[in-house]
Amino acid sequence: MAGVVKKSFESPDERRTPDKTDVQVVNLGSVKAARMTLQPGWRWSECIKPIAGTESCQIHHEGMVATGHMHVRHEDGTEMEIGAGDAYVIEPGHDAWVVGSEVFVGYEFDSKAAETFARS
């Protein structure tokens, strides 16, 4: 593999489009990265839970928010809102939803999340 690799989310290797969800995945060799575009009204427990088949999201997320806001509620009782410019880590065992009328766009670079989130 080359020492420098570049791919564009405008031409993703894979695209997933569950309800109110658009996930573009690029394969950078040893790492997969994802751009998640979530529409107002998106909620994990409504849009992704039917695909995942679990009571809460069991994916470990590491990423950053480009636009919009999302509220995250973890099974351990912690809750937080993340927004544009924030970097985040979200452990497995959570629900999340878009806050307000702005589209949420987040980028994730954890290979497991990019590889499996919103996959049917």
Question: Where do the protein language model's features map onto the residues?
Answer:
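A short, N-terminal "cap"/entry segment at the start of jelly-roll beta-barrel domains
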Residues: 1-37, 45-46
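Short beta-strand segments
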Residues: 34, 78-80, 105
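Conserved GNAT-family N-acetyltransferase fold
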Residues: 36-38, 63, 88
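Glycine- and acidic-residue-biased ligand/ion/polar-headgroup-sensing regions
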Residues: 50-76
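Short acidic-glycine-tyrosine-enriched beta hairpin
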Residues: 74-93
